[in-house]
């Protein structure tokens, strides 16, 4: 009965309250996508466990948080900012909150790290990594090889030259690191926090296409045709630029 009530709460479109969420050791759990705001009475992620936050969730309030060793809260990239408020809790060494951007594709540019606002109140932490780096740019496309030339013939004569290879495409630009606001008590030790807000790496340059081989020579009864030259290789594309780094605003209360 309790499990049924919990499932009903999780999938309610309203703000949720008094829900208990537990992620098993080495387990992965994805929150539902039906609500934009989630209130959790107790959230426990065991060692090496991962809780996935969907893109449509914009606010999560946790009354009691327990992050085990190397546990992770992974927040999907999105245009909307995400706010996390924790009233009390314990965070073990190696735990992290990840809000990295997405890698680019040939059709879509890389996505930046998600804008975050995090408030930790009565929280004891051994260490915490906040990773909100930008997504890496997609690599440039490889240029096509040139077609081979036609061999010489006794009927049509001279061999044809190989076709030139195409140039490689340019890599896409990496996305920016996130904009982060941290609200921490005055006695919270800043040295337990590690924040990574680097911009994403630029995409690799596309490789050049090779030139096609020239047509071969042909020996005929009355004469011989000469072979033709090879096509020229294309040019290697340019590597994409790295994305700009994000920034962090630390507020003590």
Where are these regions (language model features)?
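Active-site scaffold segments
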Residues: 179-183
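N-terminal domain-start segments of secreted/luminal proteins
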Residues: 17-93
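N-terminal signal peptide c-region/cleavage motif recognized by signal peptidases
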Residues: 12-14
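Glycine-centered low-complexity coil/loop motifs and glycine-rich tracts
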Residues: 50-55, 72-81, 95-114, 128-178, ...
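Sec-dependent signal peptide recognition
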Residues: 1-7
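A short, structured loop/turn motif at beta-sheet edges
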Residues: 90-92, 119-128, 184-192
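Structural detector for internal amphipathic alpha-helices that build alpha-solenoid repeat scaffolds
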Residues: 58, 116-119
């Amino acid at each position: 009965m309790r499990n049924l009530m919990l499932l009903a709460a999780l999938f309610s479109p309203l703000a949720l309250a008094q829900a208990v969420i537990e992620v098993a050791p080495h387990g992965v759990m994805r929150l539902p996508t039906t609500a934009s705001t989630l209130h959790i009475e107790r959230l426990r992620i065991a060692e090496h466990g991962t809780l996935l936050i969907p893109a449509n969730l914009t606010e999560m309030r946790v009354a009691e948080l327990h992050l085990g060793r190397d546990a992770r809260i992974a927040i999907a990239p999105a245009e909307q900012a995400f706010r996390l408020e924790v009233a009390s809790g314990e965070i073990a060494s190696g735990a992290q909150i990840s809000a990295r951007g997405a890698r680019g594709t040939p059709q879509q540019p890389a996505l930046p790290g998600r804008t975050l606002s995090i408030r930790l109140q009565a929280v004891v932490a051994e260490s915490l990594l906040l990773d909100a780096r930008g997504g890496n740019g997609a690599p440039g496309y490889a240029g096509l090889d040139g077609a081979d030339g036609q061999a010489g013939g006794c009927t049509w004569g001279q061999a044809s030259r190989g076709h030139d290879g195409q140039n490689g495409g340019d890599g896409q630009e990496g996305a920016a690191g996130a904009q982060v606001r941290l609200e921490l008590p005055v006695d919270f030790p800043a040295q337990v926090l590690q924040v990574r807000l680097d911009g994403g790496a630029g995409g690799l340059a596309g490789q050049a296409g090779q030139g096609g081989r020239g047509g071969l020579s042909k020996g005929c009864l009355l004469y011989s045709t000469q072979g033709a030259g090879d096509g020229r290789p294309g040019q290697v594309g340019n590597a994409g630029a790295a994305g700009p780094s994000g920034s962090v605003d630390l507020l003590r209360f």
